[in-house]
């Protein structure tokens, strides 16, 4: 059923087409020459598309417009266009065979709505981290800040626990600058006042060493991170890693072993405490007569 509808649509379209597409046109042919060639078939206008080709040499740039070897001829009605195609298709024009057909304009197929992909949402809603209801975050504190100074700052809200720590911060994300350390603190309060009102009140009225401070509700994830770091530090301090085993001392070198005869002679001398007799002289030796 669909193919039949498409064929009917195509046939209806071709009956209304009055433009003829001509290919294999000689590059030397002009629009005037082609119009004279089609004049007997009622061609109202002729168009030969060209392209502009520019070169570095001035000698070759005298005529930068180059024809594409095709043409479009407009006729008064579809009947004249079909007549021209029937009679002139395959005929020779300026030593080249021409090919003619109806020019059917290109139409893109319509895409069903089901296949259209939805555009991605550019402005996605960022997920806000969860904040604690009883803990505030103090930012950019002096490096030598003490626990007592922070307690005095939040004395109206009964501070319970205070964690002072240092962290690295990057000022700009697009430029790879080296990070700098800041001193911050997490303060757990015991008050019925909403945590947002406490932050606004302290940030507007309180000062620390003559400078205003930044106070915000603390993120739950940051509180858990700091508590885990404190727990790990306490565990490492309580159970230090075992020291490296000392290398065993080298064994003493064995005493030199004397020959058995020297040992026996030494033992005999030690027992008698006598000096060994001197070796016999040549006069004491027996004389051997010559044969």
UniProtKB/Swiss-Prot annotation:
The protein's role, per its UniProt record: May be involved in the modulation of rDNA transcription.
Similarity comment: Belongs to the RRT5 family.
Compositional bias segments (type: Pro residues): 239-257
Protein name: Regulator of rDNA transcription protein 5
InterPro entries xref list: Nucleotide-bd_a/b_plait_sf, RBD_domain_sf, RRM_dom, Rrt5_RRM1, Rrt5_RRM2, RRT5_SRSF_SR
GO cellular component labels: cytoplasm; nucleus; ribonucleoprotein complex
Pfam families named among the record's database cross-references: RRM_1 (PF00076)
Matching PANTHER family: REGULATOR OF RDNA TRANSCRIPTION PROTEIN 5, RNA RECOGNITION MOTIF RRM DOMAIN CONTAINING PROTEIN
Residues covered by the RRM domain: 18-105
Organism lineage: Eukaryota, Fungi, Dikarya, Ascomycota, Saccharomycotina
Region described as Disordered: spans on this chain: 235-291
UniProt entry keywords in alphabetical sequence: RNA-binding, Transcription, Transcription regulation
GO molecular function terms attached to this record: mRNA binding
């Amino acid at each position: 059923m669909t193919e039949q509808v498409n064929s009917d649509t195509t046939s209806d379209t071709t009956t209304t087409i009055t433009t003829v597409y001509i290919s294999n046109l000689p590059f030397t042919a002009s629009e005037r020459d082609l119009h004279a060639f089609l004049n007997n078939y009622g061609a109202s206008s002729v168009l030969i598309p060209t392209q502009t080709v520019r070169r570095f040499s001035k000698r070759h740039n005298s005529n930068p417009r180059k024809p594409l070897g095709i043409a479009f001829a407009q006729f008064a009605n579809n009947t004249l266009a079909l007549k021209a195609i029937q009679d002139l298709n395959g005929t020779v024009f300026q030593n080249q065979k021409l090919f003619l057909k109806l020019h059917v304009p290109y139409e893109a197929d319509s895409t069903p709505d089901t296949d259209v992909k939805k555009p991605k949402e550019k402005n996605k809603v960022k997920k806000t981290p969860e904040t604690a209801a009883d803990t505030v975050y103090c930012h950019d504190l002096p490096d030598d800040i003490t626990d007592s100074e922070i307690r005095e700052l939040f004395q109206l809200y009964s501070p319970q626990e205070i964690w002072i720590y240092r962290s690295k911060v990057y000022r700009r994300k697009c430029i790879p600058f080296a990070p700098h350390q800041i001193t911050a603190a997490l303060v757990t309060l015991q008050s019925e006042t909403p945590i947002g009102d406490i932050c606004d009140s302290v940030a507007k009225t309180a000062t620390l060493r003559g400078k205003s401070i930044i106070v915000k509700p603390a993120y739950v994830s940051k509180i858990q991170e700091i508590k885990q770091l404190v727990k790990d530090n306490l565990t490492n301090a309580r159970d230090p890693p075992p020291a490296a085993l000392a290398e065993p001392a080298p064994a003493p070198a064995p005493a030199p072993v004397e020959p058995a005869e020297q040992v026996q002679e030494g033992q005999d001398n030690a027992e008698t405490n006598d000096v060994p007799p001197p070796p016999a002289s040549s006069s004491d030796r027996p004389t051997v007569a010559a044969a």
